[in-house]
Swiss-Prot record:
InterPro entries: GlcNAc_MurG, Glyco_trans_28_C, GlycoTrans_28_N. Its main location: membrane. This is UDP-N-acetylglucosamine--N-acetylmuramyl-(pentapeptide) pyrophosphoryl-undecaprenol N-acetylglucosamine transferase. It comes from Streptococcus pneumoniae serotype 4 (strain ATCC BAA-334 / TIGR4). Cell wall formation. Catalyzes the transfer of a GlcNAc subunit on undecaprenyl-pyrophosphoryl-MurNAc-pentapeptide (lipid intermediate I) to form undecaprenyl-pyrophosphoryl-MurNAc-(pentapeptide)GlcNAc (lipid intermediate II). It is an enzyme of class 2 (transferase). The gene is murG. One of its GO terms (cellular component) is plasma membrane. It comes from the Bacteria. The lineage of its organism: Bacteria, Bacillati, Bacillota, Bacilli, Lactobacillales. Its EC number is 2.4.1.227.
Length: 352
């Protein structure tokens, strides 16, 4: 039986594509393994998925771009992670390794290359993350969402592979209940912040609940179960699975962070959106670059977190609603998307 090893983690964005691809390989008779951190979000997501995947936990160290005494300890963690990954590779002898990035992916990528296993990696952002900059040196091939420099000879630009379904699925009963609390005459605004980026949206909704619910139906994906609430013109929930796409479709506008996975999902369904990227104090600035790219293309409006107020947000919402047809036309004309089926076929072809 053919074997494939996946790696990637630290944030949901470094796991999502793997979660989409793994069922495809399982259906085609592959034995699927995953290398990550048992305390990381990658392990949580795989457990929740229920997929028939063997998880291998390794030591991980964070890759920092700045000086920290913690770097010295993490060098040893990464080194031990490489040794652990090498033993896994030599024991499994897989046909390939697929990496979605994140600091946990560096040891498996290096170990795969050392053991002669082909390495395929994926980069979602406009600028390459530090983990993928290292991984690229060991990779057989890199797939990218955005165009990369021509000097990177091993990169193939494939566009965004989104998890948005093309099928019309039945409305969940819970969605019907939510809609009975909404005013059909008001626009619906969905706030979605990812695994760590929702706090600023949560605070905005909490501070301006009255004003917001007078003018909009508000959906707030909080990541915090203590905020769960369903009342007139307001639905706050910590986490959704089957409801995720129906809520996206229900919304007239989405207010989101600038992670590539989410904004390309919005592009795929031509959904109006305001991007509030994580700042450089909380990230390497990739979300700022992603947001600027989408604004330049005419797909979205952006708003820096430091400028986020009720008034500034409402100005952006009003502008998008007033120019809805223009934004949607540009999104629908985009050629920057790739279906999961097409990407899977491309990957299988490259593996053969």
């Amino acid at each position: 039986m053919k074997k494939i090893v996946f790696t990637g983690g630290g944030t949901v964005g470094h796991v999502t594509l793997n979660l989409l691809l793994m069922p495809k390989f399982i259906e085609d008779g592959w034995e699927v393994h995953y290398i990550g951190d048992k305390c990381g979000i990658e392990h949580q997501e795989i457990l929740k998925s229920g997929l028939d995947v063997t998880f291998h936990s390794i030591a991980t160290g964070k890759l920092r771009r700045y000086f920290s005494w913690q770097n010295m300890l993490d060098v040893f963690k990464v080194g031990w992670g490489i040794v652990q990954s090498l033993f896994i590779m030599l024991r499994l002898r897989p046909q390939t390794l697929f990496s979605k990035g994140g600091f946990v992916s560096v040891p498996p990528v290096i170990a795969a290359r050392v053991s002669g296993v082909p390495v395929f990696i994926h980069e979602s952002d406009l600028s390459m993350g530090l983990a993928n900059k290292i991984a690229y040196k060991f990779a057989t091939k890199m797939y990218s969402t955005f165009e990369q420099a021509s000097s990177l000879a091993k990169v193939e630009h494939v566009g965004a592979v989104t998890k948005v379904s093309d099928k019309n699925t039945p409305e969940p009963d819970e969605l019907v209940d939510i809609q009975t609390h909404f005013n059909p005459k008001l626009p619906t605004v969905l706030f979605v912040g990812g695994s760590a980026g929702a706090r600023v949206f949560n605070q905005l909704v909490t501070d301006h609940k009255k004003e917001l619910t007078e003018r909009y139906n508000i959906i707030n994906l909080t990541g915090d179960s203590s905020l769960n609430e369903l009342r007139q013109n307001l639905f706050r929930v910590d986490y959704v699975t089957d409801l995720y796409q129906p809520l996206m479709e229900l919304a007239d506008i989405v207010v989101t962070r600038g992670g590539a996975n989410t904004i390309f999902e919005l592009l795929a369904i031509a959904k109006l959106h305001v991007i509030v990227p994580l700042g450089r104090e909380a990230s390497r600035g990739d979300q700022i670059e992603n947001a600027a790219y989408f604004v330049k293309k005419g797909y979205a409006e952006d708003l820096q977190e430091s400028d986020l107020t009720l008034d500034s947000l409402e100005e952006k919402l009003s502008h998008l609603l007033s120019h809805k047809e223009d934004y949607q036309a540009k999104m629908k004309a985009s050629k920057e998307l790739k279906s999961l089926a097409d990407f899977y076929q491309l990957l299988k072809k490259d593996l053969s």
